[in-house]
Every structure is written in structure tokens, then in C-alpha cells.
């Protein structure tokens, strides 16, 4: 029996990413987390697009990132909306328009790499509301969960065996964006103590 560390690391990271859904939802229910509706619904749609585009070029452990993210963001978005905990601002409308524009451009091209790039651009446009919200209120997002998410996605990237732009672009972008949000949550906690 061969020991394939890629499989073990990928499986462990996938379990971690799935497990993070529960404490995040608990933090929404307890009102300690106030998610941006635009970000979470936008992420659900865009992760689904990235999953399909990435899968069209081959299935690898890195596919777990957009696939699990599609599932988790959809659950979180509907939970926040149902409980009335979702935050909505006028700037979110601009981000929605930019996201729709990027999705439209992807639909016109139908090329997987272009789809991934446009989904990253659209993702950034729906991530901005969460970045702004977290900058303004660092306690509105749970630091530990964002750090664990970064660790999980990074582990998925390390577990990949196909180091191509198709398999790495979106997960690496996700690591960077999530690390920014995590850093903002810590920034607020450190300044609050000072």
C-alpha cells in the first residue's frame, strides 16, 4: 500500500473547510458575525462558476476549494438572509453590477482560463463589501475561522498534483483575499486592546 500524502492532506483540508461551516453559522445565529449578503451570495455563484470552469480542465484536489466553497457560501448566505443577519449597503449595488459584468464577459468567451480570471475579478467585486465592512468593524467577522479557512485552502493547494494555471489561479487568489480579511479582523482586535 502506497502512502500518498496528497490524498491525506487534501482529504484533511476538505474536512477542515467543511467543518468551518458550523461555527460560522453559530456565530451568525449568536449575532457575533454580521455577513455581507452581497459577498456571500456572490461568492456562492462565483465559486460555482469557478468549479465548473476548473473541472472542465481536469479534476484534482485543488477542485475541492471552489466545490466546498460553493456549498459553504450557499448555506451561509441563506442562513444569514433567513435570520435577518445579512448586511446590505449602497456600495454593494455597485459591486453586484461589476460582478454581473464579469460573469457576462465569462459567458461570452466560454474559455475556461478566461472564465477563471473573470470569476476572480467578479469575486473581488463581491469581496469588497466584506473587506470594507471588516475594516470598519473588525469584530463583525471571526478571526479564527478566517485563519483556519486560509490554512485549509493553502493545504488544498499544496495537495494538488497538477500545478497549472487552471488548478492554481482561483485557490491562490482565494488564499490572498481570505488572508486580507483575516488580517483586518486581527487588526481590530489588536487596536482595541491598545
Question: Where would I find each of the regions flagged by the language model?
Answer:
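Alpha-helical membrane-protein topology signature
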Residues: 1-194
Amino acid at each position: 500500500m502506497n502512502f500518498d500524502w496528497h490524498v491525506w492532506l487534501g482529504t484533511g483540508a476538505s474536512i477542515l473547510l467543511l467543518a468551518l461551516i458550523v461555527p460560522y453559522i453559530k456565530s451568525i445565529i449568536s449575532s457575533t458575525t454580521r455577513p455581507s449578503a452581497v459577498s456571500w451570495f456572490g461568492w456562492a455563484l462565483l465559486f460555482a462558476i469557478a468549479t465548473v470552469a476548473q473541472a472542465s480542465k481536469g479534476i484534482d484536489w485543488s477542485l475541492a476549494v471552489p466545490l466546498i466553497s460553493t456549498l459553504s457560501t450557499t448555506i451561509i448566505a441563506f442562513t444569514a438572509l433567513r435570520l435577518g443577519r445579512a448586511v446590505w449597503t449602497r456600495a454593494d449595488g455597485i459591486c453586484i453590477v461589476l460582478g454581473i459584468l464579469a460573469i457576462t464577459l465569462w459567458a461570452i468567451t466560454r474559455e475556461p482560463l478566461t472564465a477563471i480570471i473573470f470569476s476572480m475579478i467578479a469575486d473581488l467585486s463581491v469581496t469588497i463589501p466584506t473587506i470594507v465592512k471588516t475594516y470598519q468593524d473588525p469584530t463583525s467577522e471571526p478571526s479564527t475561522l478566517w485563519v483556519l479557512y486560509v490554512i485549509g485552502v493553502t493545504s488544498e493547494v499544496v495537495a494538488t498534483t497538477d500545478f497549472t494555471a487552471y488548478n492554481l489561479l482561483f485557490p491562490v487568489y482565494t488564499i490572498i483575499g481570505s488572508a486580507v480579511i483575516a488580517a483586518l479582523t486581527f487588526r481590530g482586535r489588536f487596536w482595541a486592546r491598545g
